[in-house]
Every structure is written in C-alpha cells, then in structure tokens.
Amino acid sequence: MTLKSLPAWTALQSHFEQIRHARLRDWFAPENDRAPTRAERFTIPGGGLAADFSKNRIDDETVRLLVQLARDAGVEARRDAMFAGEIVNPTEGRAALHTALRATDPQAPFHAQVSAERAKMATFARAVRSGTWTGYTGKRIRHVINIGIGGSDLGPKMVVHALHHVATPEISTHFVSNVDGADLARVLEQVDPEETLAIIVSKTFTTLETMTNARSLRDWFVARGCPEDALAKHFVGVSANPAEVVKFGIAADNVFEMWDWVGGRYSLWSAVGLSIMIAVGPEQFDELLAGANDMDRHFREAPLERNLPVLLGLIGIWYRNFFGSQSYLVAPYSEALHYLPSYLQQLEMESNGKSARLDGTFVDYPTSAVTWGEPGTNGQHAFFQMLHQGPTIVPIDFIAVLTPEHPLASHHPKLLANCFAQSEALMLGRTLEEARKVAGPGKEALAPHLTFPGNRPTTTLLVDALTPRALGALIALYEHKVLVQATVWDINPFDQWGVELGKILGKVVEADLSAESVDPAKHDSSTTALIERARAALKR
C-alpha cells in the first residue's frame, strides 16, 4: 500500500482543508485557551528534554491523525527492527546499529565488541590527556587535528564545540575536512609538529578529501623534522578498513575500529568520536552516550502521542507534504550549538533526500525539506526578516538552553528573551489595524509595511543545561526523527548513493585537468570550457 493510499493520509488531506486557515492567535485567545491550556497539552518531556509544540498549526485531531499515519506506515515495526539489528538498509544489505554504540544492555547487538573498542579509546584518551602519550621529542600533545569529512567531521566538530566548557584547556582540537588546501594550511599555521596528534577518520580509508589531507599532513611532519619511523607517535586511524590504515603507514596498534553497520552520519558515538573523548575525557563521553541512550529508551517506550522523535518527525511531514513547505530552520539560541545546523543538514538531507522508495518505485510526494540554520541571535539580523514578512512559510525549531555554560550569566536573560519573543511574534503577527496604530496619525501609507502575517509555526525545544548528557539526548532526538520521516515516506535513510556520481565524474575531470588535451566528446560543452579555463590558470 503506497503512502497516499493509506486511510490516515486521506483523512489528513480532508483535515488539512478544514484547518489550513485556522489562526494560532485564535487558538491562544483567552476565551479559547482554557485549562489545560494549549501549552500544557502540547508541551511534552522526554529523554531529559522538553518540547513545546503548541505554536504549531495543529490541534488534537491533527496529532491523532498523524499518529495513525505513523502506525499505518509501520513506524513502530521499523523502529523495533532497527534496534534489533535487522537489515534496515536494504540497498547495502546492512543493519543500522548506531543505537548499539550507546546501549547499556549486555544483550544488545555487538555489546562486547563495542565495549572493548570504547575501553581502548578511553585508555588512549587518558594517555593523551595526562601527557603520558608524547610526541617524538617527548613533548606532551597540545593539539589534536581530526581529518575526516561528512560524518567523520561534522558530528565530532559539533560536539567538541558544544562541550568546550567541559573540555581540557591543555589540548586544542582542530578539524580539517575540505580538500581545499587552505583548510589544512590554516590549521598548520597554529600548531607545532612536536606537540600535534593527527586522527585520520575514514570508513574506507580511501576518501579523496581525507586521504589527500592525510598525505599532506604526513609530509608536513617529515619536512619539519619528524623521522618517518616516529610518525606512530603522531598518527592514529579510525576506519572499518584496518588493512588500508596500516598500508597508509599508521601502526596497527594505533588503529581504532568502526563498523559497516554504523553509517557515517550516525557514527560520532563510535571511535569516530575519539577527538571528542580526548577533548572532554572518557567520563564525559560516557555521559554523552548515556543521554543518547535516554532518548533511545524514550523513543522505544513512550506512546506515539507523547513521543518526541515521533511528533517532531510527523509535524515535519505535516508542513512538508500538506502545507508544501520547502525548507525548515533550526535556530539554536546557544553559541555552543553553532555547528548543530550544519550537522543536521547532513543528518536530514543525506538521509532523506531520496526519490526512490524501498521497492524501487519513485515517490510522487516531497521528501526531505532543505534544512538550514544559524544560532540566535545572529539569525535575527540576517534572515528573520523573511521569516516574519516574506510570503514563504518556514517551520522553525528553536532550541533554548535555560542555564548558561559560561560565566557571563547576565547575557542569558537577553538571549532567552529573544528566543521566546521570536516564537511569540511569529505566531501572533500584527494585523493591518494594529499596524495603523503603530504607524500613528498621518502615516497610513506606512502601515502595510508594519504588518506581520503571523501564524508562522515553531517548535521550542528546552534544554535545562548543555551537559554532555543533554547534548546526547538532543542529537539522538534528531536521529530518530529522521527514521520516523523515512518510514512514512517509504525510503531508506541509511544509504547515500546521491554522492557517488559526482565523485566518479570528478576523477575523470581531475585527470583532464592535467592532461595534454581534453577530448571534447568526453564532456558537455560547459564542462569542457570550465576545464580548459582551469587548465590555463593552473599552468600560470
């Protein structure tokens, strides 16, 4: 049965026509918002977090029908299959067991293997943090460079930045991902090779960007005096292909394993998170895992009507497939969460930016929305104008951390006030009549410019404090949201074939850039012309 033929989908279409012009302002009006209030009904705790869904264009019937859609689409069955280690990535014939990386149950899949690798990580991290692991001249490590791309970069970078307040001040962590040499060059300007440890992270250990940077970094060490037989003091590898790591020149004892049953964008909980563990310590890393496990349990045990990942995913479908929203915004009012939007871009769009159903037929409905964002309050001075007064409706996830993780506590009420006021303003708007009063006598022409449509939907996620445990729960919340949406859309969120074609053609173009001549029959005229211009520039 296809999505559009499900009874709940048909019922939602009828319900949408009934509710599409309803005003949030009216639902919140005192005469309508009686106990239990709308905020009380639609604010739901889970996994140590809380979500206020009340400023969304939903009512109790919307939630009932969306939950029925989840049941009809098999969300519970697919969730349980994922946790059980069944094949939920059929195009690659793999399980998706990122949840096993933070499971505490000894009966969880691969528990012994995961525990052993984490213990090895902890031993190494403690040695680096304590100074007992030194560089080739005996100096302690003061800089860690994580080289990886995609899931081997975005997750660890996001977490290390978010948990800066609990990280050791003795070690600076740097992240290099781009094959553009400027990325690595800028980091190398800041570090001393005698005090630097490189973590090379690649599932296959053949990734173009990662291996290009790794080779350049190895050459840099040697050029600055590190003997080749001492590179083992400065290089470790994280991969599902240990043989290739050793072939690169990294000592076998310095190889940490990841597994093919963990997708890259879900892998920060594994040895891919070694840079996190070195920065914050094994105990705090365990807290990060514990928070994710809290959300895993909530996802498995909470009824769908009170289940944060389920509701977050279903409300996203409500806007994407019924209101026709093409993008959605993540606005963390926390500078510590600066990299969360870019992390979620990969998690959401690489997972659910698909057109092929699980049975190989193609969808006739939209899937992943464009995911974007910027921390508050910066975004208010960039794109919030469009959110408030533009013709396009963009659903928003606000994320508010209620207590600061820094000593400048007097800033925090201002930050929270802006977050809450933005959600209120987007919901309320300002009518033309109200705008006329604001404009004042004799300024009637200004009034239309002072109107706000309002009725703009937002969810506010509340985090008491940005502890490692709370951060783990927040990340897992979005991981599971992605699964919920993928299940309803009947797509595979665990592969990423869309990145392959460009990589294949990229090798052809790279060869042509250094060839004596380019066969115009190999490419379209635009690509041929671009190659020729680049060839001329590279020869200068």
Swiss-Prot record:
UniProt superkingdom: Bacteria
Active site per UniProt: E350 (proton donor), H381, K503
Pathway: Carbohydrate biosynthesis; gluconeogenesis; Carbohydrate degradation; glycolysis; D-glyceraldehyde 3-phosphate and glycerone phosphate from D-glucose: step 2/4
Keywords: Cytoplasm, Gluconeogenesis, Glycolysis, Isomerase
Gene3D superfamilies to which the protein is assigned, alphabetical: 1.10.1390.10, Glucose-6-phosphate isomerase like protein, domain 1
Gene Ontology cellular component list: cytosol
Any single biological process term in GO: glucose 6-phosphate metabolic process
EC number(s) stated in the UniProt entry for this protein: 5.3.1.9
Catalytic activity: alpha-D-glucose 6-phosphate = beta-D-fructose 6-phosphate
SUPFAM superfamilies: SIS domain
GO molecular function, one term: monosaccharide binding
InterPro entries (UniProt xref): G6P_Isomerase, G6P_Isomerase_C, Phosphoglucose_isomerase_CS, SIS_dom_sf, SIS_PGI_1, SIS_PGI_2
Pfam families: PGI
Compartment(s) where it occurs, according to its Swiss-Prot or TrEMBL record: Cytoplasm
Family (UniProt): Belongs to the GPI family.
Protein function: Catalyzes the reversible isomerization of glucose-6-phosphate to fructose-6-phosphate.
Full protein name: Glucose-6-phosphate isomerase
Species per Swiss-Prot/TrEMBL record: Burkholderia cenocepacia (strain ATCC BAA-245 / DSM 16553 / LMG 16656 / NCTC 13227 / J2315 / CF5610)
